[in-house]
Amino acid sequence: MSKHYYIGLMSGTSMDGVDAVLVDFSDDKITLVDTHTEPLPSHLLSGLQRLCQSGSDEINRMGILDRSVGKLFAQAVEGLLTKSGVDRHQIMAIGSHGQTVRHMPNLELGFTLQIGDPNTIAALTGIDVIADFRRKDIALGGQGAPLVPAFHQQLFARTGHQRMILNIGGISNITYLPGDASAVIGFDNGPGNTLIDTWIKQVQGEAYDKDGAWAASGKTDEQLLKQMLSHSYFSLSAPKSTGRELFNQAWLEQQTSDFGYLHESDIQSTLLDLTCHSIANDCLKLTEKAELYVCGGGAFNTELLTRLAALLPGYQVHTTASLGVDPQWVEGIAFAWLAMRHKLGLPGNLPAVTGASRETVLGGLFPGN
C-alpha cells in the first residue's frame, strides 16, 4: 500500500528551535518515520522576542521576520528530507504552525498571528503547505487554541481510561479524555516553561533549567506563590487560551518586585511551583484520579514531574513515552495530522475546547508548484 507521508513543522512559545517530523498516515495508523530539529539562530531569536512585545516599526520588522522564519522552516524540511531519505514528491503536504508573535483572542475582534510565510516554504521546497490553522476557529468565535486536543483524542483516547494529556511548552495545555461518551475538555492552563526559562536566562544566561536542578536547589516562597496564583487567568473557566502576552518578563518583574530579599534559586523554585500548582489545581477540578501523560519540553524536567506527582496523589504520572510516543514530537505530529485533515476536508477543531460555533476544516493551502 502507498505511503501517506505528511510533514509537521512546529515552533512554540519557548522558541527553542523548529521541530520537523515526517509522519505516515497510511493504513489508518499514525507512524512517526523521522524527526529533525532546526536550531533558531540567535539573531532571529532576539528579533522574534522583540516582536512579541509592542514597539516601533513593527510592520517592517514583522514582514522581514515573516520571510526569515519561512526560510528557516523550509531549511527544517530540507534537513528532515535529507535525514529520512524520502523523496519530496512522496510528501502529500506540510503542516506548518508558524511562530506565534501575538495571541489575543479575547478582544472585541480577537486575533492570533503566526509568522513564517507559507508561500516561502512552498516555493523553496516545492511541496504543498497547509498553514494558518488558528484563525478560522477565531473567525467562528473560538479561541483558536489549543488545537492539539482533537489530535490527542485520536491518538491517546481509550474507552474505560480517564486520561490527561499535558503538553508543557512555553505555555502548558491540558486535554482531558474522560474515557466515555462525555466531551473532551481542553484549555491552556497557564505558564509552562516560559517563566522558569526567562528567569534562568536572566540570572545565569542558560537557555533552560536542566532537569529542574536549579529550582530543586531553592526553597519556594509561599507568599510569592500565593500572589502569582491569584492572577485572574487561573480562575477563568474554559474555553481559555493564553501566551506571552500575559506571562512574560514584565509580569515576572512586577510580581517579584517586593521580593528582592529572596535568593535567586528560591524564585526559580517558586516559578516551578507556579507551573505545577496551576496544572494540579486544574487537573483536580476535572477529576480526582486519572492517568496523566506529559509531553513537550516539560516532560524532560524531572523536578517538575516529581513535584507534579506529589500534588496529584490520585494520578499516575508518566510521559507519553509510556504510550509509545516520544514527548518531544507530539505537537509536531499534531500539525502533520491537521494538514492531513485539511487535505481530506475533515474538521480539525473541537468546539467544546475552543469555543468556536462549529467544527471546521482548519488552515489554508499554499501550493508547492
Curated annotation (Swiss-Prot):
The keyword Hydrolase does not apply. It is an enzyme of class 2 (transferase). Pathway: Amino-sugar metabolism; 1,6-anhydro-N-acetylmuramate degradation; Cell wall biogenesis; peptidoglycan recycling. It comes from the Bacteria. GO terms for molecular function: ATP binding; kinase activity; phosphotransferase activity, alcohol group as acceptor. ATP binds at G12, T13, S14, M15, D16, G17, V18, D19. GO terms for biological process: 1,6-anhydro-N-acetyl-beta-muramic acid catabolic process; amino sugar metabolic process; peptidoglycan turnover. Keywords: ATP-binding, Carbohydrate metabolism, Kinase, Nucleotide-binding, Transferase. InterPro entries: Anhydro_N_Ac-Mur_kinase, ATPase_NBD. SUPFAM superfamilies: Actin-like ATPase domain. It catalyses: 1,6-anhydro-N-acetyl-beta-muramate + ATP + H2O = N-acetyl-D-muramate 6-phosphate + ADP + H(+). The keyword Transferase applies. Belongs to the anhydro-N-acetylmuramic acid kinase family. NCBIfam families: PRK09585.1-3 (NF007139), PRK09585.3-2 (NF007148). Catalyzes the specific phosphorylation of 1,6-anhydro-N-acetylmuramic acid (anhMurNAc) with the simultaneous cleavage of the 1,6-anhydro ring, generating MurNAc-6-P. Is required for the utilization of anhMurNAc either imported from the medium or derived from its own cell wall murein, and thus plays a role in cell wall recycling. HAMAP family: AnhMurNAc_kinase. This is Anhydro-N-acetylmuramic acid kinase. It comes from Shewanella loihica (strain ATCC BAA-1088 / PV-4).
